[in-house]
Regions:
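P-loop NTP-binding core
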Residues: 1-266
Length: 266
């Protein structure tokens, strides 16, 4: 049975897409069948994993709006065990087109229900907004990861996101849980970053992942090569961070296999 995890934060620049790509790739490297769903009209997960959105013929847009079979849109990536359900620019207009569709909040759920048994994990890179596409993603998901950057105003806007999650829980998806709060862009040398870590841990307590994603050059440059950081440099801090996150999620969900190693310390 697949675990569907959405990564959501309407605030840009928090590492949402980076985390979606690299968490999905890390789960795949650990040999869990993983699908990365690009539900962001910017299609950065699509390009960041090696596909040109301009050449995509069938995407999540066609699945949601035109009811095409998602199997006809899914792409195999260069990473074993990792598939992609891509996005392209047409997704920008999807929210307007969905207004008059039947059960518009459940379109993504209907799509993923057709394929979820073929994967261990489905990772959804949500749109950086709280619009209908994000509502669809949260309605389809079992849980949500909230990326928070270790910078000034880190908690700004989280109230709106948490309220949206609560609305989805009350009206559309009562089983939706918060998988965890993920601290990103951490620089141990900066006092502010350490203050943010403490502030977030005080606010969210046990919901904060033990794994913290550090600032890392290899992590930043990997998307320009169209690969995950673990495919770009498996020994980099970024690759190790995301492998540790994947292991933490696997253990939390009781899915650990004997071959999954303990977390690597830096």
């Amino acid at each position: 049975m697949s675990k569907i995890i959405a990564l959501a934060n309407q605030k840009g620049g928090v590492g949402k897409t980076t985390s979606s790509i690299n968490l999905a790739a890390s789960l795949a490297v650990l040999e869990y069948r993983t699908l990365l769903v690009d539900a962001d009209p910017q299609a950065n997960s699509t390009s960041g994993i090696g596909f040109d959105p301009r050449t995509i013929k069938s995407s999540i847009y066609e699945c949601i709006i035109n009811d095409i079979d998602p199997k006809d849109a899914i792409k195999k990536t260069e990473t074993p065990f990792l598939d992609l359900l891509p996005a392209h620019i047409d997704l920008v207009g999807a929210e307007i087109e969905m207004i008059n569709l039947h059960e518009r909040e459940y379109r993504m759920k209907t799509v993923l229900n057709k394929i979820k048994d073929e994967y261990d994990f489905i990772i959804i890179d949500c749109s950086p907004s709280l619009g209908l596409i994000t509502i669809n993603s949260l309605t389809a998901a079992d849980s949500v990861i909230i990326p928070v950057q270790c910078e000034y105003f880190a908690l700004e806007g989280l109230g709106k996101l948490l309220n949206t999650i609560k609305i989805v829980q009350n009206r559309l998806n009562p089983e939706l849980a918060i998988e965890g709060v993920l601290l990103t862009m951490y620089d141990v040398r900066l006092r502010l970053a350490n203050q943010v870590v403490e502030e977030v841990k005080t606010h969210f307590q046990e919901l904060v992942f033990d794994t913290i994603i550090q600032r890392n050059t290899r992590l930043s440059e990997a998307p320009s090569f169209g690969v995950s950081v673990i495919m770009h440099d498996a020994n980099s801090k970024g690759a190790i961070n995301y492998l540790n996150l994947a292991r933490e999620i696997i253990r939390k969900n009781g899915l650990a296999q004997e071959e999954v190693e303990q977390a690597v310390t830096l």
